[in-house]
A protein has these predicted regions:
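Generic N-terminal targeting/processing segments that precede catalytic cores or assembly contacts
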Residues: 1-389
C-alpha cells in the first residue's frame, strides 16, 4: 500500500501532508525535497506570491536519522504569507469589518469559486478558493519528492520540459531524456528550444501588459521503469488511466496525452504501433519507436513513459471577465486574486510529482515488502524472471 493526502489552505498557517507506504530503511534526503519545492516556484511569468514564499519542508514523523521508519511520514510547509492573513483565516470565530474580511462574492469564470460555492453553500467564496488554490500543489510536490527517492532506489528517473506556451511550440517537440535533463535549471521556462523560449517570454510580457493569461503543454518523461507495473485485468488497475487521472488533477490541466496521444487518432495502425525486437545481449524485448509512451494494455513495457499535460490559461485575470455578484445577482466584473500569468513550467514539476506518486504506488503493489531490503530482493527476483522469459 502507498498513499498520500494533503491539507491546508492557501493563506492558512501551513500546508501539511501524510505519506503512507514508504518502506523502512529508505534514505530520506530533506534537501532533495526542498530542491523540488524550489523548482516548483521557478518560471518566467510567476506572480508576487513566489517572492513571499520560500518553501521549506519540515518532517514531523516517520523518519529517524535519515531513514524512513515504515510508519506514516508527516510533513509541513509553512505559509509565510499567513502573517498577513491571520485574522481573515483565523480558526476561532472572528468579527471583521466588511472592508477587512476579504470576502469574495464575484466568482471568477473558469475557477472553482461558483461551483464550489453552490456545492458547499458557501456565501463567502474564499471558503472555496483557499483550498482550490494551486498553492496546495506545494504539498503534492513534497510528497512526490519522497516518491522520487523511492523510485531512484530502483533506477528510475523523472524529468519534465515545456513543449508549448500559448501558441508558441518548441522545436523539436520530442526530446531525448538526456536532452531534457540537460536543460539548465535557471532556464526561465524549462524549454529545450532557446529561440522558442525567447518568443514565449515575449508573449508572456504582452499578455501581462494586457491583463491576460496563458496556457501551454508540458511533458513528463520517466526513464528506467521496469516492465509489468499496472495491470490489464481491471479498468481501475490500468496504469495509463491512473497516470491520466493524476495529471488531470493538476490545476488548469484540461487534456492528457500519452505517447503519440492525439496524433495517433488520425494515423493508420501501421504508423502508430511500435514493432518489437529482442536484444540477445541484454535479454530484453525492445522497440525502435515509442509511440505507446511506455504503456501497452495499461501496463509498463520497459520503454520511457511519456505523458503530456495540456493547460488552459489561468482563470484569474487582471482584466477581469464578466461575472455576477452572488448577493445582488447583478452583473459585475469577477474578483481578482493575486496570481500568475502562466504556470506551465511549474505544472511540469507538479506533473513529475504526480507521475512519481503513481509509479511509487505501482511499485509497492508489485513488490511489497516492509523494508527497502525486502522490496529490493523481491524486485531482483522479478528482474531475474524477466531475463529468463
Amino acid at each position: 500500500m502507498f498513499r498520500f493526502t494533503t491539507a491546508g489552505e492557501s493563506h492558512g498557517p501551513a500546508l501539511v501532508a501524510i505519506v503512507e507506504g514508504l518502506p523502512a530503511g529508505l534514505p530520506i534526503d530533506v534537501e532533495q525535497i526542498n530542491h523540488e519545492l524550489w523548482r516548483r516556484q521557478q518560471g518566467y511569468g510567476r506572480g508576487a506570491r513566489m517572492k513571499i514564499e520560500q518553501d521549506r519542508v519540515e518532517i514531523m514523523s516517520g523518519v529517524r536519522h535519515g531513514l524512513a521508519l515504515g510508519s506514516p511520514l508527516a510533513l509541513m510547509i509553512e505559509n509565510k504569507d499567513w502573517e498577513n492573513w491571520n485574522a481573515v483565516m483565523a480558526v476561532e470565530p472572528t468579527e471583521l469589518a466588511p472592508e477587512k474580511s476579504r470576502r469574495v462574492k464575484r466568482p471568477r469564470p473558469g475557477h472553482a469559486d461558483l461551483a464550489g460555492g453552490l456545492k458547499y453553500d458557501a456565501r463567502d467564496l474564499r471558503n472555496v478558493l483557499e483550498r482550490a488554490s494551486a498553492r496546495e500543489t506545494a504539498a503534492r510536490v513534497a510528497c512526490g519528492a519522497l516518491a522520487k527517492q523511492l523510485l531512484e532506489s530502483f533506477g528510475a528517473q523523472i524529468r519534465s520540459h515545456v513543449i508549448q506556451l500559448g501558441g508558441v511550440p518548441a522545436k523539436p517537440l520530442e526530446l531525448k531524456f538526456e536532452q531534457i535533463a540537460a536543460i539548465p535549471e535557471e532556464a526561465p521556462l524549462n524549454c529545450g528550444d532557446g529561440e522558442a523560449q525567447r518568443e514565449m517570454m515575449e508573449l508572456i510580457d504582452q499578455k501581462k501588459a494586457a491583463g491576460d493569461t496563458l496556457g501551454g503543454i508540458f511533458e513528463v518523461v520517466a526513464r528506467g521503469v521496469t516492465p509489468g507495473l499496472g495491470s490489464h485485468t481491471s479498468w481501475d488497475q490500468k496504469l495509463d488511466g491512473r497516470l491520466a487521472q493524476a495529471i488531470m488533477s493538476i490545476h488548469a490541466v484540461k487534456a492528457v496525452a500519452i505517447g503519440a496521444g492525439l496524433e495517433a487518432s488520425s494515423l493508420p495502425g501501421s504508423e502508430v504501433h511500435d514493432e518489437i525486437s529482442y536484444n540477445d545481449e541484454t535479454k530484453e524485448f525492445i522497440r525502435d519507436t515509442n509511440r505507446a509512451g511506455g504503456l501497452e494494455g495499461g501496463v509498463t513495457n520497459g520503454e520511457e513513459i511519456r505523458v503530456r499535460g495540456h493547460l488552459k490559461p489561468i482563470s484569474t485575470l487582471r482584466r477581469a471577465l464578466r461575472s455576477v455578484d452572488i448577493d445582488t445577482k447583478q452583473e459585475e466584473r469577477a474578483a481578482f486574486e493575486r496570481s500568475d500569468i502562466t504556470v506551465v513550467p511549474a505544472a511540469g514539476v507538479i506533473g513529475e510529482a504526480m507521475v512519481a506518486l503513481v509509479l511509487a504506488e505501482a511499485m509497492r503493489e508489485k513488490f511489497g515488502g516492509d523494508s527497502l531490503g525486502e522490496m529490493k530482493r523481491n524486485f531482483e527476483g522479478y528482474r531475474e524472471q524477466l531475463r529468463g522469459y
